[in-house]
UniProtKB/Swiss-Prot annotation:
Subunit and partners: Homotetramer.
Pfam families (alphabetical): GMC_oxred_C
Family per similarity comment: Belongs to the GMC oxidoreductase family.
Name of the protein this chain belongs to: Pyranose 2-oxidase
Entry's EC annotation: 1.1.3.10
Catalytic activity: D-glucose + O2 = 2-dehydro-D-glucose + H2O2
Disulfide bridge partners, by residue number: none
Taxonomic classification: Eukaryota, Fungi, Dikarya, Basidiomycota, Agaricomycotina
Enzyme class: oxidoreductase
Tele-8alpha-FAD histidine sites (modified residues): H170
Naturally occurring in which organism (per UniProt): Lyophyllum shimeji (Hon-shimeji)
Entry keyword set: FAD, Flavoprotein, Oxidoreductase
Job description of the protein: Catalyzes the oxidation of various aldopyranoses and disaccharides on carbon-2 to the corresponding 2-keto sugars concomitant with the reduction of O(2) to H(2)O(2).
Active site feature: H540 (proton acceptor), N583
Record-linked SUPFAM superfamilies: FAD-linked reductases, C-terminal domain, FAD/NAD(P)-binding domain
């Protein structure tokens, strides 16, 4: 059952209360009981979008993040005095990773934790007979090991990142717009905000433009790259008779003007930047790191209204005398803890039924239903000999190309390749269409897989990643168990997911298309032939807290306000109710912008929440 604020406080251990009173968080000593306008759980780019817009509108925001702040952008003001560090910086901006992108693979691996790990046979036949082993029929459980997870229904590679900035501290920065709806693919594509097609296009275009401005999307940062130009124009030439479009991949980044060999990748830090570098805004914002949002509590009246958020100071667990749990009260509550974290908090609050079938008294009956993910095909190729040979000849008559090659050959006469060491990587895509219903990335980047050994020079390797779309179906579920907890003492997530036949057919065609495109570029790297990746590896889980028009099939309305709740909002990729192949971050930011404007309008009384605030490098 869901808890009221009074029940939460009554159940709270007397030993943890302060002088027998409600253990309020220390922020209320500064702001008072009614001084917090917006509580946000989660500090990724979506939570940061809410924070930026709300703070710029003059609202006081308290944000909690379960992880630590471990990457910072340090700025120096013009007069030379130090400006405070801004958290959530993209870790790939470190020079060592820009010089050797394959080393960044291990950073990504270290930042990801699997969500649900099936418990396999733990019998080790060659183990010392006197050593411990699990009794027959039982298993050890820790760090995501889940005895309830059936392997054939799992998204085995689905993972989460805990830390300020979330996955934006290591993401690929790909920010395409999700394609508009297509009649031949119902349930897939950009979700509708209006049933009037013209109004829907107008609103989405405005939201996408604002999101692109906020995160700093560009398609021009790799224009003066030999490899990018070679791959892009070669594919355009190969497919010109079929009129298939190949174009630069939209990326949230900018090339440094004074050091053009480096690109700066954007992250949540770019959204936090204006807050941390404006004294007035900074006073309106509090970020509590290493704080878990445990659950939410209702006010206890007839209205479904959140009265408090219970948070736990994870660092205080090291000191038994420290205050572990406390309560934060706000006017509005925003959950931006990811497609796993949001339903986990709501489930732990008692707002949804157990297991697969919702209970009749569930406050949020569609929580964790209709989930979608992206089947993913991957390969790596080594560029064709004739393409590499053509580099010396400046085949497209570009002055910057000719100069870069000449300088490289002059400085490095023993190098077998004419491609400069610091030549930017390719960043190419072909759009999602009815004929080719998948998103593509033809590039060279670091993921949790696809690292290249020393045998082949990275300059001639191209990665091909194809992302498919799956159909939203009510029986594809994310459920939670009380008898098993994750590594952070929250209910263990379990997937009940099976793709539709139509989704599988599209995935087969997607693989064939990737192989055809790859054959136009070069030969397969023996260690990375065409393959389907583990389910969930795209890390684009969606639909867990889906929003939309239909209360019967969604969790919240199009302003992300949970149905029948007065002040509870959901945010992030989980809000996207449709299937899609593109990277979802930009679309989730659009939902956040629309939602933040609604919150500002409610709390400020009549403003639309739009702003023209400045932000770093954009």
């Amino acid at each position: 059952m869901s808890l009221s604020t009074e029940q939460m406080l009554r159940d709270y251990p007397r030993s943890m209360q302060i002088n027998g009173q409600i253990p309020k968080n220390a922020i209320h000593e500064t702001y008072g009981n009614d001084g917090v306008d917006v509580f946000i759980a989660g500090s990724g780019p979506i939570g940061a979008t809410y924070a930026k817009l709300c703070v710029e509108a003059g609202l006081r925001v308290v944000m909690v993040e379960i992880g630590a702040a471990d990457s910072f952008y340090a700025v120096n003001a013009e007069e030379g005095t130090a400006v405070p560090y801004v958290p959530g910086y993209h870790k790939k901006n470190e020079i060592e990773f820009q010089k050797d992108i394959d080393r960044f693979v291990n950073v990504i691996k270290g930042a990801l934790q699997q969500v649900s790990v099936p418990v396999r046979n733990q019998n080790v036949p060659t183990l010392d007979p006197g050593a411990w082993s699990a009794p027959p029929g039982s298993s050890a459980i820790s760090n995501g090991k889940n005895p309830h997870q059936r392997e054939f229904e799992n998204l085995s590679a689905e993972a989460v990142t805990r830390g300020v900035g979330g996955m934006s501290t290591h993401w690929t920065c790909s920010t395409p717009r999700i394609h508009p709806p297509m009649e031949s693919l119902p349930g897939i594509g950009r979700p509708k905000l209006s049933n009037d097609p013209a109004e829907d296009d107008k609103e989405w275009n405005e939201l996408y433009s604002e999101a692109e401005r906020l995160i700093g999307t560009s398609t021009k940062e790799f224009d003066e790259s030999i490899r990018h130009t070679l791959v892009l124009r070669s594919l355009q030439d190969a497919y010109k008779d079929r009129q298939r479009i190949f174009r630069p991949l939209p990326l949230a980044c900018h090339r440094l003007k004074n050091a053009p060999e480096y690109v700066e990748w954007h992250s949540a830090e770019n959204l936090f930047h204006s807050i941390y570098n404006d004294d007035k805004q900074k006073k309106l914002f509090t970020l509590l790191t290493n704080h878990r949002c445990t659950r939410l509590a209702l006010t206890g009246g007839y209205e479904k209204k959140i009265g408090a958020a219970e948070v736990r100071n994870l660092l205080a667990t090291r000191n038994p005398s420290s205050q572990l749990d406390s309560y934060i009260m706000a006017k509005v509550y925003v959950l931006a803890s990811g497609a796993i974290g949001n339903p986990q908090i709501l489930y732990n609050s008692g707002f949804s039924g157990l297991q697969v079938t919702p209970r009749n008294d569930s406050l949020i009956p569609n929580l964790g239903r209709y989930i979608t993910e992206q089947p993913m095909a991957f390969c790596q190729i080594v560029l064709r000999q004739e393409f590499v040979d053509s580099v010396r000849d400046d085949p497209y008559g570009l002055p910057w190309w000719k100069e870069a090659v000449a300088q490289h050959i002059a400085k490095n006469p023993t190098d077998a390749l004419p491609i400069p060491f610091r030549d930017p990587e390719p960043q190419v895509t072909t759009p999602f269409t009815e004929e080719h219903p998948w998103h593509t990335q033809i590039h060279r980047d670091a993921f949790s897989y696809g690292a290249v050994g020393p045998e082949v020079d990275s300059r001639v390797i191209v990665d091909l990643r194809w992302f498919g779309a799956t159909d939203p179906e009510a029986n594809n579920l994310l459920v939670f168990q009380n008898d098993v907890q994750d590594g952070y003492s929250m209910p263990q997530p379990t997937f009940r997911y099976r793709p539709s036949t139509a989704s599988n057919v599209r995935a087969r065609k997607m693989m064939a298309d990737m192989c055809e495109v790859a054959s136009n570029l070069g030969g397969y790297l023996p260690t990375s032939p065409p393959q389907f990746m583990d389910p969930g590896l795209a890390l684009h889980l969606a639909g867990t807290t889906r929003i939309g028009f239909d209360k019967a099939t969604t969790v919240a309305d199009n302003n992300s306000l949970v149905w029948d709740f007065a002040n509870l909002y959901v945010a992030g990729n989980g809000t996207i109710r449709t299937g899609f192949g593109e990277n979802p971050t930009l679309t989730s930011m659009c939902h956040a912008i629309k939602s933040a404007r609604s919150i500002i309008n409610t709390l400020k009384g009549g403003t639309d929440g739009k702003n023209t605030g400045e932000h770093r490098n954009l």
